[in-house]
């Protein structure tokens, strides 16, 4: 498996992303990737520059909806050239029709513990993530741009 690093928005993007563990593993970012840093730029700028593949985790709302921030962050990734692999809905109900209509690159959902579809949904998510990761690697995602 890959090493999982935990970082927060207060850490230096350049220092963190230049570490071998960040280049070869997964990063769980806690905070707002679009928040402007005092020295300029934001984490999302750095992730785009380093071609770090991204998966956005989005909280599900009652009834299976998601906040508009999901579309806003996906658009910002596109604008900055950040390699967005896809979005994953956390919790609530999975509304396949709504997810198709919003046109975002959804990978699936992670149902709450105890939900009957949990194992099937997680298996599907692993398959989609694997396929998209292979595609990302083949297109040079993860290679730092100077």
Regions found by a protein language model. Give the residues of each.
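Switch II (G3) loop of P-loop NTPases
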Residues: 4-13, 19-40
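Charged, low-complexity, helix/coiled-coil-prone segments
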Residues: 14-25, 67-74, 145-146
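Charged phosphate-binding loop/patch that engages nucleotide di/tri-phosphates or the phosphate backbone
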Residues: 127-146
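Conserved catalytic-core segment of NTP-binding enzymes
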Residues: 29-131
